[in-house]
Amino acid sequence: EVNGNKCTVPKLKDVINVCKGKIKLNIEIKTGNNDSEDFVSDVVKIIENTDFVDKCVVTSLDYRALRKVKECNPKIKTGYIMAVAMGDFYDLPCVDFFSMETTFVNGRVVERAHKLNKEIHVWTVNDSDSLKKCVDLEVDNIITDNVAGAKSAIATHGDDVFSIVLNQLK
């Protein structure tokens, strides 16, 4: 219930159908103790049945879920959400990219990931200093709560790299 109104949670296939042809989706799988054994494969089937394999990424804090996604369909791009970026995490075979908070990103992290053909996706980049840092480090994806602010910061800077990011935000 929201503001006194009864609401229903939309089904994934309905969300995909609304987004089709407009935006790509980051589908986060949050696992729990009560999940069925087929939970992850059911998500993959929905992605496949809606012809959305190349229009989404699937992310999770649970590496086992990402491994299951790749077992079901290796073409689906997967991202490991990291609460902290410590240790030797770079060579996880079922991960195409790492999603991490902006404070954990530095040149060494980006360089090591890129050497293994892994991307770095950074969240939550809501100010121009963080945006500039991410662009300078050549991260692969920026996640923000403030798209208008990010566009403004990029437009103000005027750099070629910033212009490339701006085009991705459009």
Where are these regions (language model features)?
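Metal-dependent phosphodiesterase/phospholipase catalytic core, i.e.
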Residues: 1-77, 94-95, 100, 114-116, ...
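C-terminal active-site rim and adjoining tail of enzyme catalytic domains
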Residues: 4-5, 79-170
